């Protein structure tokens, strides 16, 4: 049975669990009332529930129906005959007077869930899937509230999941004609599938016997037998809530041992364990006792949220604070006690470990594992919170606290671990630290580093990446390079590749394109990347995109186009960059895939690369490369035919030319298209204006500088397009006129035209003084002749179609 079904009160096995036994045996009723009232109608599996109150109108009514003796009215009426019952006529009169009943938070939550159940039942009659979806989302949020308040999983929630699951399975989408309702149906189907998978055991139990699901008895969890010292706690089980309060007569270590033995048990109550450990911390006398208490409390807090999608934020902060308090104790007693993974196991908690040669008592524990788990829970929360809400920004503020803890853990390990084992054991801390900074600019890294070093004790120093007091640009570069090199020396291939890719990403992001490119080619990390872990493949794809953006910032258009071309040809760009939502992955993945595997396939929203910016950069590069080449090819110049890609500008232009009605540009794609049409006309100013009007450029940190560099390239490519298009109308063109028309220096025009003539073997040359472009007439067909030939072919085809017999006779 799941631990959510555990109760905290003692249960007498002699008392009957069925309602019919209540009717037949007054002795059992008496024994039941003496042992403690047992609620069969409890909707929660982990707590007992008192009988619900009823209005006087209902209580006066006569019970009816075949199971009338099971009605609450019958049981309430019978209570006044029990020993010790406080039922009286005055109670009835109080209820008749209409006194307000104050409900607990749990009862209010149950009422809200019951209201959801009723609304879904009503919506079922009219197939109102939009209401069903809204109410299902509501009860999902209520479940989170219930679990955050340690109420467990209410049975009414299981009922609603089963109810919606049955509705989905009994309905067919083909019968739904309304598009909005059909969309709501699909969304409901996906969400209920995911939640049903997470609560599979409870649903199976409900479907096995729905009627007795609410009335199932709960059993007190079995605890290990107590020794002679523990005989202060007698009876059928140990009440953990009174454990710490009895510590004046019951030793701290014995209490801690009982808590440790209770952890991981089937019916153990995590909330009570945490409360007990917090009370034990208040009475702990020695540093050794406080260290042991924290080493038990921290993992217990983490275990409490095992079945949740992420640890609730208030619990996460409590765990974070506990870990910092543990570090405070360890820092104060660093010469006496140290927590390390290299210590020997000590089965006897009451006996402190023997001091080593340096007089230090080593306690077995992994502080880094606690920090890693907190970091995982932090990432999970970011993946599950709506990235467009204020909650996400609020949660993101905790990243600084998380990074402070990572740095503190690393520095403590450097101070306590033998030098020969440091680099191996610190690798996990290095990769976590690198994961938090590799995608940030130097300015952001400087802020987070300065804040982190201020938060850790000043006595700590790092020999791997020394901190001089100010995280300037040079320090940030040395930090990423130092962490990457240290990880590259590890035997673990995964860590080696991840460190290398993170280093390349950081280098490209901060404007060093050539260095990043050489590093990628030198390490050959791209070989066999398809066989690597999914998270590595995602990081590699991110590196490729960042390299393309870095090349574009430096106006290396050809290299940018070449780098991004293959990646943007994919129809699943969001997926291969790890930028799809966790919920979408869960709905599309098979039931066999674990939540950990799904989390590897996506990144928190603040780490995403803006796909609109990537599209804009690629299409702009495509515009500058393809429009001149396409114009040259279509005007009869012998040149290599431009291949057509999915997002190439040539495809957009061809589609645009086939349409008749053209509105003003709205999307990024349309702005680039209109810029291409302006370039074809030789209007470089219009081309630049259309590109500059796209607001997505503001996402580049140096957007003004990038657009200024782009201006000259647009002028040159527009000039080349103009020459290819209109050369048949000229015998010679003045360089000075071109300089005025395209706002380019004359020497730049001469250099460009010399290169074009050499590459394409045009019948064009410069005069001796290089003041004119002389165009030699060749055999090329003029535009008018092209239209005439085309029209002649169409006339002939039409004539043959209208007079087939005349054509055959001839």
UniProtKB/Swiss-Prot annotation:
GO terms for biological process: formation of cytoplasmic translation initiation complex. Disulfide bonds: none annotated. Residues 12-33 have a biased composition (Low complexity). Residues 1-98 are annotated as: Disordered. Pfam families: eIF-3c_N, PCI. Residues 34-58 have a biased composition (Acidic residues). Keywords: Cytoplasm, Initiation factor, Protein biosynthesis. Residues 1-11 have a biased composition (Polar residues). Its main location: cytoplasm. Residues 605-780 form the PCI domain. One of its GO terms (molecular function) is RNA binding. One of its GO terms (cellular component) is cytoplasmic stress granule. The keyword Lipid biosynthesis does not apply. The keyword Protein biosynthesis applies. It is found in: Cytoplasm. Component of the eukaryotic translation initiation factor 3 (eIF-3) complex. Belongs to the eIF-3 subunit C family. HAMAP family: eIF3c. Component of the eukaryotic translation initiation factor 3 (eIF-3) complex, which is involved in protein synthesis of a specialized repertoire of mRNAs and, together with other initiation factors, stimulates binding of mRNA and methionyl-tRNAi to the 40S ribosome. The eIF-3 complex specifically targets and initiates translation of a subset of mRNAs involved in cell proliferation. This is Eukaryotic translation initiation factor 3 subunit C. It comes from Candida glabrata (strain ATCC 2001 / BCRC 20586 / JCM 3761 / NBRC 0622 / NRRL Y-65 / CBS 138). The lineage of its organism: Eukaryota, Fungi, Dikarya, Ascomycota, Saccharomycotina. The gene is NIP1.
